[in-house]
């Protein structure tokens, strides 16, 4: 279930402020953020965000296809390394 249309999309104020400052100065520096919950606005296109995944900051370059999604969708929090093969135990039986 999505967010109510009358509320509008959510973005943290400090994040929007940083993007606006860089757009005024025509800069494209990496913006470090912990705000995974912020919605990607059209103003964010072309910027790179370092989104925190709980362990490190993952660089996310924003393209036009990402508008409307959340920043956290592009920085996975879990890493699956695969199941361990326990062939030795199964062969003994």
Swiss-Prot record:
Protein origin, superkingdom: Bacteria
One Pfam family per UniProt: Ribosomal_S19
Keyword RNA-binding present in the record's keywords: the answer is yes
- Which keywords does the record carry? Ribonucleoprotein, Ribosomal protein, RNA-binding, rRNA-binding
Q: Which family does it belong to?
A: Belongs to the universal ribosomal protein uS19 family.
Classification via NCBIfam families = rpsS_bact
Question: What does it do?
Answer: Protein S19 forms a complex with S13 that binds strongly to the 16S ribosomal RNA.
Instruction: Identify this protein by name.
Output: Small ribosomal subunit protein uS19
């Amino acid at each position: 279930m999505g967010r109510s249309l009358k509320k509008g999309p959510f973005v943290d104020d400090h994040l929007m402020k940083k993007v606006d400052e860089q757009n005024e100065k025509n800069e494209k520096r990496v913006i470090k953020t912990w705000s995974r919950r912020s919605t990607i606005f059209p103003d964010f296109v072309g910027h790179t965000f370092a989104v925190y995944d709980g362990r490190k900051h993952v660089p996310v370059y924003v393209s036009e296809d990402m508008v409307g999604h959340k920043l956290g969708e592009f920085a996975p929090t879990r890493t699956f390394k695969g199941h361990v093969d326990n062939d030795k135990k199964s062969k003994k039986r």
